[in-house]
UniProtKB/Swiss-Prot annotation:
Binds 1 Mn(2+) ion per subunit. Monomer. It comes from Shigella dysenteriae serotype 1 (strain Sd197). Mn(2+) binds at residues 213, 232, 269. This is Phosphoenolpyruvate carboxykinase (ATP). It catalyses: oxaloacetate + ATP = phosphoenolpyruvate + ADP + CO2. Substrate binds at residues 65, 207, 213, 333.
Length: 540
């Protein structure tokens, strides 16, 4: 066996990292466990052992991604292809960075990593060998190496022997940029990408998700340009090989609804769809743990064991975890290798073409039906809208819904114009004869959330085909086709108007929501394709 798979300090010098005497290459889980619990570690490097066997770490002030500190080098590679924050009507996080400032940031990170004991993890992003990225992660922090080992696809010994990285991620979490003001950047922290050098730099933030979502943003750039759909969704497959994908923003039920004892999980967050079918980008899951209980979500709870890595949870002195405590952040998380879930697709997280495409929304306005069947144009319209709404409490106890529109149910991670993702998705759907549905997991006129029991019955009706055979009627204003009845679902809730004391109450709320949809979609009307889709949306 070659030491470090033949990776030498000289090879790191090619990236600008010098004077490295100790490389820990693709460490085993056992070694990472020892490293994280090393009593000499201080600050955010230190791990704490919990009673479930998993190590817990803190990520400091950054307990989520830092979208305002995200930059992409604008050069000949990206100038005409990237969806830039400073061009067009759409708002996004893709702020341009000059090649000169990139060189300065790269100097800061390589200086931070030089002369240190480094962890180097080689892994794949993408379960399809033809289109996967071979990524090399370089960090001085053991638990960050653990995080990427959990989240990305772990190569076999044979694959490692011939590993040539397509992309380099240098994580300099301990360094910051003192010249940020002169360079007109957002802050001293940075998450920067260079598509020509094929490199990501991280400075100032310890949050592990920057590495996960950074590579997702890169797949979101590279794949659609090859005609492959790149999707922020979960996916599962039934006994007959029938594949379903679930799009949805945070809190709409992506993970919960795709974790189904009757079906095998392909993945819970990031997927591609190519000529062979749907494939996972990842080798692990990154689940929210706030208010987690063994009773409500046994699969996730049972996945928290040795080799899982908890982030920002409260660990009591006896090692037990207070999952209800959100004092550090509501965004408490756990990463674990996908095989910690029993019911998964093996040995590779991929399956055939999807025939059911489900858009999940949690409508706090109480306007949208629990389920509707979409036309091809409505599919594009609702995909580009990416709507959900949260209930935000105010001090007087009045709860006003807050709408969120996030293009393609993942605007934060898009690298190309949203219409490009919609076009690729629709092409894939048409070729596979796939049907799309809009499922509201939120509220209705009763003021209560639609029950998980009803939602699961709706998903079953979609997946077993009974919804496609049901009689439908059209909901006015939104022109959505709603089934008149479904097995196992309370018929009264299918028409949202029936859940109000009077139809006028629904009408009033519907007008408010319809206007929000129309105003949001205006940003897509600067292209002929976008303008043509306006008719598929609500009409006042």
């Amino acid at each position: 066996m070659r030491v470090n798979n033949g990776l030498t300090p000289q090879e790191l010098e090619a990236y600008g990292i010098s004077d490295v005497h100790d490389i820990v290459y693709n460490p085993s889980y056992d070694l990472l466990y020892q490293e994280e619990l090393d009593p000499s570690l201080t600050g955010y490097e230190r791990g704490v052992l919990t009673n479930l066997g998993a190590v817990a770490v803190d990520t400091g002030i950054f307990t989520g991604r830092s979208p305002k500190d995200k930059y992409i080098v604008r050069d000949d590679t990206t100038r005409d292809t990237f969806w830039w924050a400073d061009k067009g009507k759409g708002k996004n996080d893709n702020k341009p960075l000059s090649p000169e400032t990139w060189q300065h940031l790269k100097g800061l990170v390589t200086k931070q990593l030089s002369g240190k004991r480094l962890f180097v993890v080689d892994a794949f992003c993408g379960a399809n060998p033809d289109t996967r990225l071979s990524v090399r992660f370089i960090t001085e922090v053991a638990w960050q190496a653990h995080f990427v080992k959990n989240m990305f696809i772990r190569p076999s010994d044979e694959e490692l022997a011939g590993f040539k990285p397509d992309f380099i991620v240098m994580n300099g979490a301990k360094c910051t940029n003192p010249q940020w003001k002169e360079q007109r950047l957002n802050s001293e922290n940075f998450v920067a990408f260079n598509l020509t050098e094929r490199m990501q730099l991280i400075g100032g933030t310890w949050y592990g998700g920057e590495m996960k979502k950074g590579m997702f943003s890169m797949m979101n750039y590279l794949l659609p340009l090859k005609g492959i759909a790149s999707m922020h969704c979960s996916a599962n497959v039934g006994e007959k090989g029938d594949v379903a994908v679930f799009f949805g923003l945070s809190g709409t039920g992506k993970t919960t609804l795709s974790t189904d004892p009757k079906r095998r999980l392909i993945g819970d967050d990031e997927h591609g769809w190519d000529d062979d079918g749907v494939f996972n980008f990842e080798g692990g899951c990154y689940a929210k743990t706030i208010k987690l209980s063994k009773e409500a979500e046994p699969e996730i709870y049972n996945a928290i064991r040795r080799d899982a890595l908890l982030e920002n949870v409260t660990v009591r002195e006896d090692g037990t975890i207070d999952f209800d405590d959100g004092s550090k952040t509501e965004n408490t998380r756990v990463s674990y290798p996908i095989y910690h879930i029993d019911n998964i697709v093996k040995p590779v997280s991929k399956a055939g073409h999807a025939t059911k495409v489900i858009f999940l929304t949690a409508d706090a306005f109480g306007v949208l039906p629990p389920v509707s069947r979409l036309t091809a144009d409505q599919t594009q319209y609702h995909f580009l809208s990416g709507f959900t709404a949260k209930l935000a409490g105010t001090e007087r106890g009045i709860t006003e819904p807050t709408p969120t529109f996030s293009a393609c149910f993942g605007a934060a991670f898009l690298s190309l114009h949203p219409t490009q993702y919609a076009e690729v998705l629709v092409k894939r759907m048409q070729a596979a004869g796939a049907q799309a549905y809009l499922v509201n997991t939120g509220w209705n006129g009763t003021g209560k959330r639609i029950s998980i029991k009803d939602t699961r019955a709706i998903i079953d009706a979609i997946l077993n085909g009974s919804l496609d055979n049901a009689e439908t009627f059209t909901l006015p204003m939104f022109n959505l086709a709603i089934p008149t009845e479904l097995p196992g679902v309370d018929t009264k809730i299918l028409d949202p108007r029936n859940t109000y004391a009077s139809p006028e109450q629904w009408q009033e709320k519907a007008e408010t929501l319809a206007k929000l949809f129309i105003d949001n979609f205006d940003k897509y009307t600067d292209t002929p394709a976008g303008a043509a889709l306006v008719a598929a949306g609500p009409k006042l």
